[in-house]
Structures are given as C-alpha cells and as structure tokens.
Amino acid sequence: MAILINKKTKVICQGFTGSQGTFHSEQAIAYGTNMVGGVTPGKGGHTHLNLPVYNTVHEAKAKTGANASVIYVPPGFAADSILEAIDAKIEVVVCITEGIPVLDMIKVKRALIGSKTRLIGPNCPGVITPGECKIGIMPGHIHKIGDIGIVSRSGTLTYEAVAQTTAAGLGQSTCVGIGGDPVNGTSFVDCIEMFLQDDETKAIIMIGEIGGSAEEDAADFIKQSKIKKPIVSFIAGITAPADKRMGHAGAIISGGKGSAEDKVEVLQSAGVIITRSPADIGKTMLDLLNKI
C-alpha cells in the first residue's frame, strides 16, 4: 500500500521543459514513474520527452487525469505554481524549489487549508515509493522495496538512511523529504500518522534537525498515538556551534527552543530510539527490529 504515491499515480511536471524539469523527468520516466505530461506556459501543444506539454495545470489534469505534480520552477514563481496546482485540485504536489520567500509560502499555507491538495516541500528531495513511483531528485538506484518508512527534513541524510536500510536488507515502503524551510506543506506528524496506519510499513526512521518545533510536535503525537511501531531518529545539529548560520532556512534556534538536545530528550521520552551518528541509522534500526 505504501503512502502518498504508488504505481498508479499519474504525474505531471510544472516547469517541464526547463533544464531541471527535463533532467529529473527523464530520471523519473527511466525509474518507471507514470509521467503523463508537463506544464510550461506558452509551450502548450508541443511534445517534450515524448509527452504532451500544456499551458496550464487545469488543462493538463483535464487531458491526462493527473493526480500528482512535481514543481521545478524558480523561487520567484514557485508559489504561484503551487497555488495553480491547488486550484486544479491536484492531490499530491511536490515542490523541489529552494529559496521561496516566506511570505509567498504563508499564502500557500493558507490556500492549503480546506483544499484537496497535500503539499510535500518546498526545498525537499521529494517522495518515492521504491519500485513504483519516484517524484523528485533522489537517486532511484539506492532504494529497495521493503517495509521501513522514512521521513526527513534533510535530503542528503534521507539518502544515507535509504542506503543503510537497503544495505541491511530492510528496504523502504515510502521515503518522504518534507523539506528544510520554516513554512512547508507536510509535517513529521502528518507522515508518521500515515506510516502508522500503513500495513506495509513495519517501522519508521525520522531524521530531524535543529530549529523549529516539528520534532517536538512529532514526539507529542507519538506519545498519544494508539498505534505503536518501532521508531528510530537522528537529529542533525547536536554539535552545531551557537550563533552560526546553518544550511536550512528552518534550522534556527530561537528563544532557547529548538536545540538538538531538547529534541533528543523529548523524542526519547516518547519511546523513540535515538542514534547519535548518521552512520548508525541502518544498524540501529536493524538491531531494534531483531530485538522485537
């Protein structure tokens, strides 16, 4: 079953004919993703990568039945692209773009309320259900069909968790990069809830980082959840020096809250197993499952 996407998901690409849209659409098609077309305003009626190009998301959905979209659009235009997909009632929208202005994302966040759209990102690697559907920039070959659900604020650390669970023979059910920006569409809580309810997901890896309260919110949810599954977490930034700017816009410790140690403590109190090194994520999960 997995979560969010599967082999039946029909995907369009916004920013389809640009360099990034072209390259990553080629990779998705090669992986087996059911790409059905793309959107580039002004280029409707043409074909690209042997797929139809449309001027609008509305037209693309009407002609192809698409229920998912991936956005490779520059930061100044990305929010409008998300809003267009929301207006077209696309079910899953994955925005890869980094650097979208916060005020633009606040407008998007408001538009998501009561909509039919689930936004993944922005500033994220995307989402993949191994062997079925790849939407985003992650390397497909490191994934393996399995039963570990992975959710992460960091793209490259997601790949570490994937490579290690693949090497351990565990594989993944679905991997979701929720993005590193302060305002995003889908949270740890959203993904953990879906993984807990998914019969194909036996355990969960959650990769967090300093800044914000997403990990604390997840810990509260895990405590209160009636469904229990093994969860391993790594929090990036434990050794981050004070007053130093880090990589993600959301990696800001403010008001004495959002530190890595605070997050570790609250997650441990919820029964989550913490690994202190990203190199031990796969081993920690394998050891935990062997004890059950």
UniProtKB/Swiss-Prot annotation:
CoA binds at residues 17-20, 43, 96-98. Substrate binds at residue 159. One of its GO terms (cellular component) is succinate-CoA ligase complex (ADP-forming). Keywords: Ligase, Nucleotide-binding, Tricarboxylic acid cycle. One of its GO terms (biological process) is tricarboxylic acid cycle. Pathway: Carbohydrate metabolism; tricarboxylic acid cycle; succinate from succinyl-CoA (ligase route): step 1/1. InterPro entries: Cit_synth/succinyl-CoA_lig_AS, Citrt_syn/SCS-alpha_CS, CoA-bd, CoA_lig_alpha, NAD(P)-bd_dom_sf, SUCC_ACL_C, Succinyl-CoA_synth-like. Its EC number is 6.2.1.5. Heterotetramer of two alpha and two beta subunits. PANTHER family: SUCCINATE--COA LIGASE [ADP_GDP-FORMING] SUBUNIT ALPHA, MITOCHONDRIAL, SUCCINYL-COA LIGASE SUBUNIT ALPHA. Belongs to the succinate/malate CoA ligase alpha subunit family. Succinyl-CoA synthetase functions in the citric acid cycle (TCA), coupling the hydrolysis of succinyl-CoA to the synthesis of either ATP or GTP and thus represents the only step of substrate-level phosphorylation in the TCA. The alpha subunit of the enzyme binds the substrates coenzyme A and phosphate, while succinate binding and nucleotide specificity is provided by the beta subunit. This is Succinate--CoA ligase [ADP-forming] subunit alpha. It comes from Rickettsia prowazekii (strain Madrid E). The gene is sucD.
